[in-house]
């Protein structure tokens, strides 16, 4: 993930410009309540943290995980500047997620925002996240699906080379297979789809 250490400054600016609306919609679908504990994997530069923190409040908790020190440094600056003492930043390989690693017995909700198209062994990562969510908790996945047939060549090149993402992955499928009360929001994206899928763990 050294690529993302260098990429962090541009990622934060570009991603928020392009996907700020999608982020807000995905977090809305989590139906977070004050006092909840929410997991953010991968957190990247922490762009979701202010929104998540505003929903769970001072009595809740945000656990944000990323493998890139450069990304986490930017996330940490947000947390320190805001003075939040209920946001935990964890530098870790998401394939090794566990209750001990994140320091919680379980979480009430989890979000995977623009990450499952990037991380290795993405199905394993998703399952680790899903397993940490308590029954009745909500999970949201937001990512891009660009199959390369109808999508813009510029978009495909950007995500493959700059973001190092494989946007042909159908990253919502493991959630759809295991969750109930599914909600899906699609936005056209250069001929592809910016897709948000959320569901409740049985």
Regions found by a protein language model. Name each.
Residues 14-15, 140-195:
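C-terminal alpha-helical "lid/dimerization" subdomain adjacent to the S-adenosyl-L-methionine
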Residues 108-121:
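A short SAM/SAH-binding and catalytic strip from SAM-dependent methyltransferases
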Residues 123-135:
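A short glycine-rich, Lys/Arg-flanked "PGG" loop and its adjoining helix->strand segment in the class I
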Residues 39-41, 45-96:
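Class I SAM-dependent methyltransferase SAM/SAH-binding core
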Residues 1-31, 47-51, 74, 150-159:
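Conserved class I S-adenosyl-L-methionine
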Residues 95-110:
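A short acidic, Gly/Pro-enriched loop at the edge of an enzyme's catalytic core
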Residues 197-202:
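C-terminal lobe and adjacent flexible extensions of AdoMet/dcAdoMet transferase-like proteins
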Residues 57, 119-120, 133-134:
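Helix-to-beta-strand junctions that scaffold the AdoMet/dcAdoMet cofactor pocket
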């Amino acid at each position: 993930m050294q690529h993302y250490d260098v990429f962090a400054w541009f990622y934060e600016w570009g991603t928020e410009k392009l996907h700020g609306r999608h982020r807000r919609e995905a977090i809305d679908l989590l139906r977070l309540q004050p006092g909840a504990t929410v997991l953010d994997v991968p957190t990247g530069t922490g762009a979701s943290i202010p929104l998540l923190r505003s929903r769970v409040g001072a009595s809740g908790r945000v656990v944000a995980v990323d493998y890139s020190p450069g990304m986490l440094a930017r996330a940490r600056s947000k947390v320190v500047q805001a003075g939040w003492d209920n946001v935990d930043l964890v530098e870790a390989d998401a394939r090794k997620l566990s209750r001990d690693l994140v320091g919680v017995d379980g979480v009430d909700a989890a979000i995977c925002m623009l990450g499952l198209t990037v991380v290795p062994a993405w199905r394993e990562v998703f399952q680790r996240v899903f397993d940490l969510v308590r029954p009745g908790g909500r999970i949201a996945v937001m990512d891009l699906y660009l199959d390369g047939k109808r999508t813009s060549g510029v978009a495909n090149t950007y995500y493959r080379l700059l973001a190092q993402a494989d946007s042909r992955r159908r990253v919502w499928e493991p959630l759809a297979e295991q969750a109930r009360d599914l909600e899906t929001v699609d936005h056209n994206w250069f001929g592809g789809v910016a897709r948000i899928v959320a569901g409740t763990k049985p």
